[in-house]
Amino acid sequence: MAAPISPSNYSGVLKVAGAPVGQELGRYYLREAEQAYQSGGSIIVIIATDAPLSDRNLRRLARRAFIGVGNTGSSMSNGSGDYALAFATAEAVRRTPDRRSGATIIEDLPNDKISPLFQAVAEATEEAVYNAMLQATSTTGVDDHRLEALPLDRLKEILARHGIGTPTK
């Protein structure tokens, strides 16, 4: 199992299940070349897994989170600070004081068994980003800079127009 969490604050052209939500809302990065619109923002993804992964495979797992971020429409533009961190809770890979006192054998998941975790992290990261966006509220920050929450009613309309989230017969 792998479980990402992500506080999302980044720019891009929002997509939900392939639907061009950002374009249809008229709220997206680079919508008008002459507009003085700041790109950037940041995203941080933290991934916890109970799989026994080596430090090398944890780095590989963390990199796969950005597949999910990209699926939401982020281009990870210049000025964007994008980070992913993965850690394992499996007892087999824990570095306890006893294990640090001498040579040890670490039993970790072999490379040829990790692809399903890569897929899971990409999909779960995409969902974590959507969850963060859908739970966000409008806010006013420094210098009265205001960010509006996604209009959920409009989001539902856009998704329905694209046949997403509608009941099938």
Across the structure, where does each feature detected by a protein language model lie?
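A structural signal for small-residue-enriched, beta-sheet-centric alpha/beta enzyme cores
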Residues: 1-169
